[in-house]
Amino acid sequence: MKREVKFSLVFRDMWQSAGKYVPRVDQLVKVAPAIVEMGCFARVETNGGGFEQVNLLFGENPNKSVRAWTKPFHEAGIQTHMLDRALNGLRMSPVPADVRKLFYKVKKAQGTDITRTFCGLNDVRNIAPSITYAKDAGMISQCSLCITHSPIHTVEYYTNMALELIKLGADEICIKDMAGIGRPVSLGKIVANIKAAHPDIPIQYHSHAGPGFNMASILEVCEAG
């Protein structure tokens, strides 16, 4: 049986490399029509920590910038998503709970559909409040498994974490292979295990290309569901 695979466009190196202080929002909105015209992306990352930092460095209002950047994608029926650092929100240090709760309402009002929440420690306790806040704001809560390779980080470890996040209310799971070092076969097994328990839960795979595993990993996770 054929399976539909959807693609998400995620920007990273523009913000987290030596040239991270570009582009401005006026440049982003010029790029948006070309992305839409490509016709291959179901989702596009439009805001999150990296974006807001760039806006502020340029003296731009992040509220206006995010609205301008999400608008063309919504008009084309493309969902928008953002990155959320759990207890840290969009920052690199913890944010009070009341600020985090308000943050989701603001993001929803700006036009953000999905929040991808991750904790670098894979501590579900840090992610749990984000699930509640996102859903209360009317957003889709996508929770991440931060992938690495070690004797501790086994297929069973990640499967159990995913099942716990789904039990807490996560709408989707992201296999966040942040360094691209996840082993393709192991990633496929993680996806298969999640799908066996929750066939209808959407799973998104996020990879980096550096180590060279990502194309094999993409094939494995797609084959697994």
Where are these regions (language model features)?
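Conserved, mostly hydrophobic/aromatic
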Residues: M14, T117, I173, G225
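A structural motif
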Residues: G39-F41, T112-I114, A170, D200
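Active-site beta->alpha loop and helix N-cap motifs at the rims of alpha/beta catalytic domains
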Residues: P33, G48-I166, G180-P184
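Catalytic cores of alpha/beta
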Residues: E156-L165, P211-A224
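N-terminal amphipathic alpha-helix/helix-capping segment at the start of soluble metabolic enzymes
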Residues: M1-A18, V66, T70-K71
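Short glycine/serine/threonine-rich phosphate/pyrophosphate-binding segments
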Residues: A18, R100, V124-I127, G212-A216
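Active-site/ligand-binding-proximal alpha/beta "capping" segment
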Residues: A18, R183-I203, E220
